[in-house]
Amino acid sequence: MGVQHLLKLRMASPHPHPHPGAPLAARPLSALASFFLARPSSTAAAPPPRHVTLSCSRPHCNHNQWAASRCRGTAGRRRLQVVVAMSSSAPPPPPGSVQKSEEEWEAILSPEQFRILRLKGTEYPGTGEYDKLFAEGVYECAGCGTPLYKSSTKFNSGCGWPAFYEGFPGAIARTPDPDGRRIEITCAACGGHLGHVFKGEGFNTPTDERHCVNSISLKFIPASEDSKL
């Protein structure tokens, strides 16, 4: 059937607005013209975009975890960096971190060190090696090597024992004597006896404290050999 014949039939039709499902002969003139005269597109229409769900091949991850932490790899690396950064400035040993039996201490300490550090003895005033020493350096525990005092905190108290106005943070433990008259100071790491601390004596120091320490309880490390200053 030719186009002209269809057009004639359409013009003679009594129904100007047929149903969309009507045959071609019953459709409007504009629809017929579009049907026969429209050129086919040279390029097919692009398919609608599909929704893509990201997933991870690692069995322990779902796509939400992948999007949030890239299979936890990024978060794990960050945690590792934090741990490394924290370890670069290590705090002093925690209290009681050096544990030895009294027999072990007796084997590694000299008799005088054992008497003072472990049996809480006291050396005679004015006889200690470090009483009059004011060189720059660090004083460590003679028992376990924990840094206790900077030389910059040492002062001349005239008492006959080395005197310091403060120790390294967390390095010194304080325990009141049973009679309550004095406060004993010990190495926080190994419990070695250092001496006693007194406050309010009027010394011109930042803390108005005097750590009265036995020289035998200490080991001096000169500044040229120490990196903790």
Curated annotation (Swiss-Prot):
InterPro entries: Met_Sox_Rdtase_MsrB (IPR028427), Met_Sox_Rdtase_MsrB_dom (IPR002579), Mss4-like_sf (IPR011057). Its main location: plastid. Its cofactor is Zn(2+). Keywords: Chloroplast, Disulfide bond, Electron transport, Metal-binding, Oxidoreductase, Plastid, Redox-active center, Transit peptide, Transport, Zinc. It comes from Oryza sativa subsp. japonica. Belongs to the MsrB Met sulfoxide reductase family. The lineage of its organism: Eukaryota, Viridiplantae, Streptophyta, Embryophyta, Tracheophyta. This is Peptide methionine sulfoxide reductase B3, chloroplastic. Residues 102-223 form the MsrB domain. Residues 1-71 form a transit peptide. Catalyzes the reduction of methionine sulfoxide (MetSO) to methionine in proteins. Plays a protective role against oxidative stress by restoring activity to proteins that have been inactivated by methionine oxidation. MSRB family specifically reduces the MetSO R-enantiomer. It is found in: Plastid, Chloroplast. The gene is MSRB3. GO terms for cellular component: chloroplast; cytoplasm. The active site is at C212.
